Regions:
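Gram-negative outer-membrane beta-barrel transporters
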Residues: 33, 71-78, 166-167, 171-176, ...
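Outer-membrane beta-barrel translocator domains and adjoining extracellular loop/strand segments
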Residues: 1-15, 48-56, 90-96, 123-129, ...
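Outer-membrane beta-barrel "beta-signal"
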Residues: 157-159, 313-326
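Predominantly the C-terminal beta-signal and adjacent terminal strand-loop region
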Residues: 299-318
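Outer-membrane beta-barrel pore domains and translocons
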Residues: 1-5, 30, 41-45, 83-87, ...
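Transmembrane beta-barrel architecture of outer-membrane proteins
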Residues: 18-26, 43, 60-66, 93-95, ...
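Outer-membrane beta-barrel signature, preferentially recognizing the C-terminal barrel domain
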Residues: 16-19, 103, 107-109, 113-177, ...
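Face-selective signature of the C-terminal outer-membrane beta-barrel domain
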Residues: 1-103, 168, 205, 210-212
Length: 326
């Protein structure tokens, strides 16, 4: 008989039920040629991890205070922001970011930013049910001893409008302590990691069609071993076409992920996973001024692929949705 606890899985399987509540209050004040914003937000996470016989529940509250400011001085734009977050488990942590932009030629701008970050592990990563378990492997187990990520990052870029092409190129450098990842079938902390990358984005319109292209080169490495981090492709491409035929909106998206490395836990070795290409298509139609219907086909050509070694991803998927505004 069907059991809502086990779903379509075996009776011994454990499943997670995650609930989140979020409240935010903010205010914005115009100052000179810019603005100052501030506020408070609160988030509560609840996790129930249960089988047909046992159930464990966990809860965590996080309260944050934030302040941001932006000011335009001639051709220079300055921004700064800061946050203080109190995590019920990990206590108080402060983060900040600053950025500057300079329009050195009409239509062309240089930007530079630096900031810090903090990311607590999710309740699912700490206490949740084992994920992706199957007859082929034990899955990925939670780890209650996970530490939060702490990071420093800088980014420099140039953007401009050259003829019909709106483009941006940027370089970034992230230094992360206690990066949350998984290996040997369990969530872990990578003590120290560095992620460096170069990204180019471009947007251009040709007749009724808009083109959006993103090219990325990423070098993600474990600082202790010098190895490339698992499941992270160095080369990534995303190309999207969007357009409209009368009232019908349409889009076609292509995504390419280059080769990645992963951990073959059963045989104690690293494996190289080849690159993959995926296509998605979507349509959107306003039936009335209030009702819009959307359809999407993901993995259009029903490609067999894996983003994680040993775990087959979904084949072709069909989605139909609608939204109604009052």
């Amino acid at each position: 008989n069907y059991s809502s606890d086990a779903g379509r899985y075996a009776a011994g399987t454990t499943l997670d039920d995650m609930e989140q509540r979020y409240i935010q209050w903010g205010n914005n004040i115009e100052v000179g040629h810019g603005a100052i914003s501030g506020g408070v937000d609160w988030k509560q996470e609840k996790l129930t991890s249960s089988s047909t016989t046992l159930s464990d529940a966990y809860k965590r509250d996080t309260t944050g205070l934030y302040l941001t400011g932006q000011q335009q001085i001639d051709s220079v734009t300055l921004e700064a922001s800061g946050r203080e977050d109190h995590d019920e488990q990990f206590g108080w942590h402060g983060t900040w970011q600053t950025a500057a932009g300079w329009e050195f030629i009409d239509g062309y701008r240089a930007t530079l930013s630096y900031g810090t970050g903090f990311l607590a592990p999710s309740l699912g990563q700490q206490y949740g049910a084992t994920r992706f378990a199957s007859s082929y492997g034990p899955g990925i187990a939670s780890n209650p001893n996970l530490k939060p990520e702490e990071s420093k990052q800088w980014e420099a870029g140039i953007d401009g409008l050259t003829g019909p092409l709106d483009w941006r190129i940027s370089a970034y450098h992230y230094e992360i302590q206690n990066l949350i990842d998984y290996k040997n079938n369990q969530y872990i902390n990578v003590k120290s990691a560095t992620i460096k990358g170069l990204e180019w984005t471009g947007n251009v319109t040709t007749g009724p069609v808009e083109h959006h292209l993103t090219l990325q080169y990423v070098d993600p490495r474990d600082d202790d071993t010098g190895k490339v981090l698992y499941r992270r492709a160095k080369q990534q491409v995303k190309y999207e076409l969007t357009g409209q035929i009368y009232d019908l909106d349409w889009n076609v998206m292509y995504q390419y992920l280059g080769k990645r490395y992963d951990d073959d836990y059963d045989n104690g070795r690293d494996v190289k996973m080849g690159g993959l290409s995926l296509w998605d298509v979507g349509l959107s139609y306003p039936v009335t001024s209030h009702l819009t219907v959307r359809g999407k086909i993901a993995n259009l050509f029903d490609k067999d692929y894996e983003t994680v070694y040993g775990y087959q991803s979904a084949g072709r998927e069909y989605t139909l949705s609608g939204s109604y505004t009052f």
